[in-house]
């Protein structure tokens, strides 16, 4: 499945009104375990928009050096790397691949994020293919605000365990009878300490089979 072609085909058929989209792919090559890391959707950072100001609809693609080497993308890769085991291979993915400032603005543009929405449906088709092609990967959702979509899309069972951080705030969720899926506190969260990051790392390391 050519993710870039499928995204552009839908965008050309039904103009989303979004500034761009992200193609899932490897953002850090490592010799360690593989992680597919999900966010809600790609944000629209100011320096990204300036870098692609002359494009009607831009694509972030890990295979495109120019598009994947923006300042915001480098910052983002660093943040994700800080909470994963050393030398991990990181695949960036999204619940929805079209850009926006937040969930509300995204739904204002493309409609409710649910099955039957063409942008939602294509994103899940891409994600199913991505996971199928990386069966050994652990699946991580960043943040808890949009965990409803994560659980609905992947039909996750009830929570098995919640691990709290230094300030006693939720740090990580594990799912009962499914040791591949986790939700972790967003790496941009205020108050996330180095001790918290290490706790996330060690929990994930202990789940690697």
Question: Model-predicted segments: where are they?
Answer:
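C-terminal capping/extension of enzyme domains
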Residues: 1-16, 113-124, 147-209
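Active-site and ligand/interface coordination hotspots across diverse enzymes
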Residues: 1-70, 76-79, 123-133, 171-177, ...
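A structural signal for short, well-ordered beta-strand segments and their strand-loop junctions
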Residues: 35-39, 88-95, 138-143, 183
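Short, solvent-exposed loop/turn segments at secondary-structure junctions
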Residues: 41-45, 96-100, 144-148, 186-190
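Alpha-helix C-terminal capping segments
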Residues: 80-84, 204-207
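Acidic, glycine-rich loop-and-strand cores that form catalytic or ligand-binding grooves
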Residues: 130, 135-155
């Amino acid at each position: 499945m050519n993710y870039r072609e499928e995204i552009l085909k839908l965008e050309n058929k039904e103009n989303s009104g979004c500034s761009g989209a992200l193609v899932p792919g490897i953002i850090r090559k490592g010799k360690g375990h593989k992680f597919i890391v999900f966010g809600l959707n790609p944000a629209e950072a100011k320096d990204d928009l300036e870098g692609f100001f002359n494009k009607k609809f831009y694509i972030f693609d890990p295979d495109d050096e120019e598009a994947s080497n923006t300042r915001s993308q480098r910052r983002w890769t660093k943040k994700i790397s800080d909470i994963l085991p050393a030398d991990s291979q990181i695949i960036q993915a999204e619940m929805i691949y079209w850009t926006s400032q937040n969930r509300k603005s995204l739904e204002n543009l493309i409609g409710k994020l649910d099955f039957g929405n063409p942008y939602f449906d294509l994103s899940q088709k891409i994600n199913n293919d991505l996971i199928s092609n990386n069966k050994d990967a652990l699946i991580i959702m960043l943040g808890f605000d949009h965990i409803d979509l994560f659980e609905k899309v992947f039909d996750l069972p009830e929570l098995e365990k919640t691990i709290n951080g230094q300030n006693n705030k939720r740090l990580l969720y594990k799912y009962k009878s499914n040791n591949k899926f986790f939700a972790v506190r967003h790496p941009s969260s205020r108050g996330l300490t180095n001790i918290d990051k290490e706790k996330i790392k060690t929990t994930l390391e202990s789940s690697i089979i």
